[in-house]
Each structure stands twice: as structure tokens, then as C-alpha cells.
């Protein structure tokens, strides 16, 4: 999944996308932080060792924290943001859509207005296979996606089929 994300970022940047906002649950998050967003592994381990105190609030599960960085693409520098993630699977999806829409408005690039495309900001949502199929918020977010006030012009959805969330065996394995 890391090579796929990297390819999406590089191609989107090559087409002129200036920001990409990623939403995902915990599985694969640390890998993405280090290998895509460029977070220093030493800093990551310091957070887990308790050497870094949160600036405000009571703290959260370490792998729920967000992060942002800039990367070079064929089209120039692009800003990447990994959204903070609550423990409720898939709830990050509508939050991410709102964040992207706000960024598009800030850039005066909201889709469906004055022939704008919204291509300056790309939402990317990474789902686990069980959560994608089982959480109604995914379909509810799809339902909002084409309404005038909520559309972002399209979202890249990646479903990771890790078969961890399902409790029944595959028929071939039974």
C-alpha cells in the first residue's frame, strides 16, 4: 500500500495538486508516517516512550495523532496532511471531506462553482476491508459526495484487504 500511496501523491502533484489530505485508521499508520510523510522514526519512538508530552489536552493513543509535511512532486512542492483519527473506525471519512472542502474554499477552488474542479486539494481515504463493508458512515459519506455544499470533486478510496476484521473463515479455508 505504501508504493500505491506514493504513486498517487507523485501523479497528483504532477497534475498540479497542491495539498493531499489522508484519512485512515490505525493499521498501517506508522508505516505511512515514516515512509510517506517522512516523520523521523526517532521522533516517533520518543512519542511512544513518553519523552514527548502533548502540547494541550489529555493526550490520545499515540497512533491516532495527525502529522503534516511537504514533499516534492513532478509539479512542485505539495503539502501532505494525515488527519487525526479517533478510535471509531471510519468516522474520519466525513471529517476528512470537510477538511478538504474547507481547503478548497480557502484556495477558491471549490467544485461545481464557476467551472472549478477542486483539483488543488485531493482527499485520500484508506479503509480496512471489514470497516468499509460494515460501517454505515462510509455509505453516508458517499451519499453526501455529490451535493453542492459537500462535494470535493472526488476522493481516492483504498480498501486494504487484510481480512483481520472478519470473524468467519474463507470458504476455501474451511
Residue ranges and their predicted role:
Residues 1-156, 160-173:
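Conserved internal helical-beta-strand scaffold that buttresses enzyme catalytic cores
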Amino acid at each position: 500500500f505504501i508504493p500505491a500511496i506514493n504513486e498517487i501523491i507523485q501523479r497528483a502533484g504532477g497534475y498540479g495538486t497542491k495539498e493531499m489530505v489522508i484519512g485512515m485508521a490505525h493499521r498501517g499508520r506508522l508505516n505511512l508516517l515514516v515512509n510517506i510523510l517522512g516523520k523521523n522514526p526517532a521522533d516517533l519512538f520518543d512519542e511512544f516512550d513518553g519523552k514527548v508530552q502533548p502540547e494541550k489536552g489529555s493526550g490520545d493513543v499515540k497512533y491516532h495523532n495527525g502529522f503534516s509535511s511537504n514533499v516534492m512532486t513532478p509539479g512542485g512542492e505539495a503539502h501532505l496532511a494525515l488527519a487525526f483519527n479517533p478510535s471509531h473506525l471510519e468516522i474520519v471519512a466525513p471529517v476528512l471531506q470537510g477538511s478538504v472542502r474547507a481547503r478548497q474554499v480557502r484556495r477558491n477552488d471549490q467544485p461545481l462553482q464557476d467551472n472549478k474542479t477542486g483539483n488543488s486539494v485531493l482527499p485520500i481515504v484508506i479503509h480496512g476491508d471489514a470497516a468499509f463493508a460494515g460501517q454505515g458512515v462510509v455509505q453516508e459519506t458517499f451519499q453526501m459526495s455529490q451535493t453542492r455544499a459537500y462535494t470535493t470533486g472526488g476522493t481516492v478510496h483504498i480498501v486494504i484487504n487484510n481480512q483481520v476484521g472478519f470473524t468467519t473463515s474463507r470458504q476455501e479455508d474451511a
